[in-house]
Amino acid sequence: MQQSGAPCDFSSSDSWVILSPIEQSIKRKIEAVGTPLKDWDINIYRGVLTGYNEAFIISTEKRDEILANCADDAERTRTAELIRPILRGRDIKRYGYNWANLWLINTHNGIKGKLDRIHIEDYPAVKAHLDQYWDKISKRADKGETPYNLRNCAYLEDFSKPKLFYADITQNLNFVYSDEYMFCNNTTYFIASTHTEQLQYISHFLNSRLIDWYYRTLSVQLGANAVRMFSIYVLEIPIPHEHETDVYKAYGLNREEIAFIESN
C-alpha cells in the first residue's frame, strides 16, 4: 500500500503509522540501538487517587492553618511530615516543574505487613479539617480502612525515592527528575528506580526532540499536537545502554536525518 509516496508494511502486529522513507530509516535506527524501557530496571506508576481532592489536596495557606491549629510542637512536627508537596500534570515542564503550592494530606492506608496505616487520632488538626468534608469523604469509593485514609497504594514508598515525573497528556514529552519526597496526582505518572544515575541518563533521552518524534510513531495523537502517555507505549521507548550524551550520535543518525528531526 502507498499513500503520498510513502511505503507501508502492515505485516507487523504493532501499532502503525504511515512513514516516509527517511522516517522509516530513523525509526529503524532508534529501535536497533536502543533497549525498550520495559527491559530496564524501572517501574511506571500513576499518581495518587484521593477520591475527593477538595479535602485531601490543599493550598499552602490551608497547610499553614492546619499546622497553626496543632496543640503542641509534637503534633505540629508529625503533621508537617504527613502533608507533602504534590504535582499535577500541568505543572511539569522539561527538566523542571512549576509547583502550584499544593499539598497532599497523606493519610495513607499503610502497606500490608510493612507499614501501618495513618491513625487520624494522632493528627487532631488534620481530622478537624477533614471532618468539614465528612459527607463527601465518607461516601467516596476511593478510600482506605476509614474515610480519613487514602486508598491502598502498594508503591507508596516509591514517592520518597528518585523518580521521573511526566504528565498523562502533553504537547511535548516533558520529564523531570526528582529525589524529593513528593507526590503527584492522577494526571501524572512517574518512573521509579533505585538507580539515580540511570534515571538521570534516561531523562536526557526522554526529553530529546528525537524521542518526542519517535513516541508519536507509537502513540495516538490528540488534536494537533497532544499525546497520551500510555504506559504500554512509554515502556516501548528504546534507550541506548552505551552512555553517549549526544542523542543523535547515540542512535547513529546521519546529517540528513538530524536535519529532518530538527525541522519538525
Q: Language-model segments: what does each one mean?
A:
Residues S208, H241-N264:
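Amphipathic alpha-helical coiled-coil/heptad-repeat segments
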Residues S4-P238, K249-Y251:
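Polybasic, glycine- and aromatic-enriched phosphate-binding surface used to engage nucleic acids
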